[in-house]
Amino acid sequence: PLWGLPGNEKAKTGLSNDMTVGNIAELAQDDSIAFRLRCEGEAPPRSAMYYRGPVLSRLDGQKWTGSGFPRAPSNQQQAERAPAGSAADTVRYEVLLQPHQMQWLLTLDVAVTPPALPAGWRSLQMASMEWTSHRPITDVLRYRASSQLNYHADASIPAPYLRPYLALPPGLNPRTRELAQRFLN
């Protein structure tokens, strides 16, 4: 999600580590360019251009934050064997990412292989399938990536890796908790 970055008097829309309930309405819109993307060959339709950045998967009742869990090696191997889209669904592209002071590498959803970064840069895929760099993006960064637009994750991902995405905040309305449990079963 593209949310508020702490700034001068008012936050601007941008990448953030968290989002608090009710604060999104207070964000000032920022028309500056966040990144540019150039596809090899034909670009996918706009409706397929969902960009994966930070995934805010934990809610404490008031604030969403990211889980920060890197993928386990066995989970990575499962993802590589998972049924993905056809070769026709693979999009290869180049990203020119503007500095955002965070570590996220924006990719079309879902980049199942590491983005090709310049020398001296390393990437890590998180459990939520977002890609991060080993250091904050403080200058313009150019990299190549490839994504499968119709990717489907392996349904046999171990429960410990799913738990953060299924957790409910404390103090939740009992009827809401009951409904959530029905969804999980």
What is the role of each PLM region?
Residues 1-185:
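Helix-boundary/low-complexity linker signature
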